[in-house]
Curated annotation (Swiss-Prot):
UniProt subcellular location: Periplasm
Any Pfam family hit: HMA
Organism annotation: Shewanella putrefaciens (Pseudomonas putrefaciens)
Organism ancestry: Bacteria, Pseudomonadati, Pseudomonadota, Gammaproteobacteria, Alteromonadales
Gene that this polypeptide is encoded by: merP
Disulphide linkage map: none
Name of the featured protein: Mercuric transport protein periplasmic component
Length: 91
């Protein structure tokens, strides 16, 4: 019985590790004014699973933290593109 309890605990702990938030940086080169980041940030925050989005005009970068079980990088780049600001994953 103890073995079963330990194995169950291990499995549950492993599942939590898989659901860890993921952070990516997107390049958004078409931002051309200081108000553009607000539009990009708002679009990213509407994506399911996004917990944080920080967009900077000076660097033209968006740093996004999201749950990769609920969303994808493709969904993030589509959101910025649909808002008028195409983006790509910064490698």
């Amino acid at each position: 019985m103890k073995t079963l309890a330990l194995m169950s605990l291990f499995v549950l702990t492993s599942l939590n590790a898989l659901a860890a938030p993921k952070t990516v940086t997107l390049e958004v080169p078409t931002m051309n004014c200081v108000t553009c980041p607000f539009t990009v940030e708002k679009a990213l925050q509407k994506v399911d699973g996004v917990s944080k989005a920080e967009v900077t005009f000076k660097t033209k970068l968006a740093v996004v933290t999201f749950d990769d079980e609920k969303s994808t990088v493709k969904a993030l780049t589509e959101a910025t593109t649909n808002a008028g600001y195409p983006s790509t994953l910064k490698e």
